[in-house]
Amino acid sequence: MKQYKLMQVALLAILLFGWAGCSQNEEEVPGNVRNGIVLNVTDTGIISNEPSTRTEDTGFVTTFTQGDQIGLFAVKDGAILDEINNMPFTFNGSSWSGKPILYDDRLVGVNFYAYYPYQSEMTGKTDLIGDDFFAPLAAGWELTTEQSDQKAYAKQDLMTSNATALIGENGNYSLSFQLTHRMSLVVVKLPSTRYIFTDAEGVAMPEETPYVAMSVDVAFYLDNVEEGTKISPYYDAKKDEYRLLRKPSSENQIIGHYNDKQCTLDTAEKMKEGKYKRFVVDGGYKEVTHHLQVGDYYYADGSVVSGNEAEPAKDNCIGIVCWVGNPMPSVLYKDVAGTPYTATNDALLRSHPNCVHGLVMSLYTETGKFSPALTQSIHDWFMTTSFTSSYVSVTGYYDANENNKNKPLRFLGYNNSEVLDLYYDTFKTDFECFQYQDDCESSFPSPSITTGWYVPSSGELVALQDKDNSLESKLNTKLIKVSDKTMDISATYWSSTERNNKNMYIVTYSKTAGSAGTGGVKTNTYTYRFFLGF
């Protein structure tokens, strides 16, 4: 496997050539054999095929990793030496190892050739007459359309050296190979947006990890959009770009799909050996400063559109921002006297430390049951487990750590969803709420930079309404523009906060407040709205 970096890398490793008179046993020899020949392996990199105003383009350069293998040939007087005929050497992370080769007069005047990745069968794949020893190998090299796996991608990136002579000085010998890439590379940068969220005064909200909305539903095809023409490039998450190895002089059109859009990338006359062509689609990466507010529209790629937008796009809208701020319990309630909420038991902080901006309410809504009646409450089971050090209980009532008048108002939906999952993993009890949650995720897929959808706690639902009737004035007025299902103020809503083995907390609304009640029998039918943190 290889890793690719935009920097020049030279790997210094020991190639185990022994001296005459050393052991000739066919054993694997470590790379630090005394007086061994030093092997310098340098990748010249894949550089841009565009004229550059920079003094240097280091391109995409290969770093070998443990387990990688190169093949070695030695040629003298127009013939390959039998003992160095496609000899494999394996990189162990710091040096190369293989069968020892004894140095003597036979190696005088020998030219060495190396290639990557090693192939066990090389018959007919070298040329002893022309200038390019590996010309047949490169000409017959086959690329697959499946390159999404890093290992599979690396094994298709053919690199070869030119003739390399053994250098001797004061009894020390070395070989220095420069490997050049024989394929060409397509690099695709799809649109992504870094959001800098601010408050009303324009002050940026604190965050440790940049919030970047990336393209979703990405797919690539060769020439035509058909199932048989689909290709899978390698995705570099750190650079947020796709890479596809292509044969030099290939002239396919690459068709990309993303965010319900399509782009066509014409590679004709752009695929050059050892060079890459970068395509930047719709401007690629950009930064946007956004005043985040309740009522903003939230989309499947993580993008956010102002709630003041007159005609927001309906496609890929998955919810409405319903609360702004850091929703982590250890942050929200850190100043509460005797607070039980700490960084240690904050599941949201632990699993999604970047979700510090707010909460989104789903467009999805449905009515149904919550779960079967249980012989033992989830809270009672939870208190007997080791999970008590990593989570807080789902109870809104039986909690010795906090005034039970306040507990139903806490933001604990993500914590509760995790505890419900742990309960299911233990007892395999089918909760209807999971089915609706999965349906929500299927209908309105959440971005990977979020928590994913969960049943909100009673406190999160209560917070939707206030004396200004924000549920209707700030949420429903936005919902109606992207959905035919507004928040029914007369409905009763499920929460993930538990009352006892038979009941969950349910939330109802008036024009001025939300109220959490304990009468939510788990087998009754009430309404669902799901939340996610971002």
Curated annotation (Swiss-Prot):
Record key words, sorted: Cell outer membrane, Fimbrium, Lipoprotein, Membrane, Palmitate, Signal
Localisation: Fimbrium; Cell outer membrane
Lipid tethering residues (S-diacylglycerol cysteine): C22
Gene3D superfamilies according to UniProt: 2.60.40.3570, Fimbrillin-like
Source domain of life: Bacteria
A GO cellular component annotation in the UniProt record: cell outer membrane
Span of the signal peptide: 1-21
InterPro entries noted in UniProt: Mfa-like_1, Mfa-like_1_N
Lipidation sites (N-palmitoyl cysteine): C22
Transmembrane annotation, as ranges: none
Residue ranges the record assigns to the propeptide: 22-54
Classification via CDD domains: BF2867_like_N
Quaternary data: May be part of the fimbrial tip.
Family: Belongs to the bacteroidetes fimbrillin superfamily. Mfa-like family.
Function of the protein: Probably a component of the fimbrium tip. Fimbriae are filamentous appendages on the cell surface that mediate cell adhesion and biofilm formation.
Name of protein: Putative fimbrium tip subunit Fim1C
Organism annotation: Bacteroides ovatus (strain ATCC 8483 / DSM 1896 / JCM 5824 / BCRC 10623 / CCUG 4943 / NCTC 11153)
